[in-house]
Amino acid sequence: MKLTKKLLAMALAGVMLLTILTGCSGGKTGDRLVEEYMATFISENSVDTPITHDVPEIKTVADMFETSWLKADGSWNITSGNNSNDPKYKALKDIFASYKDSCTVTLVAFKVDSTQSELDQAMRVMMSSFYSGLPVYSSGGKTTAVKCATRLVTRENKSYRIAVIIYDHHAAG
């Protein structure tokens, strides 16, 4: 009986591992895997900085995402900056308003295809956040905590990776 339980436990563990590695357990697992890769990348550059994935606002952004937010070349079709009158940018600022005083909030979005692994997508998120991310809020100071979250959304039969990275400059340690 003990041997049977051990064999069943090992088989279940193998199936779970295979599910995670192949991404065959639904969109949430892929999202979480990209978040974990993002956190690993961030932790390499921000040693001893706590990193969480607690950004409920990403769901709101993913739900309201439209393909018109991106130009054909993949750059943002949203005008950002303090003087921006772009209603899409104002809506994003409202969504992330709780971070406005002491955080840097950067939004990233790009089209993905089925050949891109979660690792590839995470690397694109991180590189895009530096070069072509949409700055929602900017704040200076030492980073004391980081939050990152992502969602894969489908619009018009195309998939898009939406991600947010929030560098907190005031969190208590």
Give the label of every model feature segment.
Residues 19-23:
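C-terminal motif of bacterial Sec signal peptides marking the signal peptidase cleavage site
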Residues 26-92:
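Short, well-ordered surface patches within globular domains
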Residues 1-11:
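Bacterial N-terminal signal peptides that target proteins for export
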Residues 89-173:
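A well-ordered secondary-structure block
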Residues 4, 24-45, 140, 157, ...:
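Short N-terminal secondary-structure initiator segments
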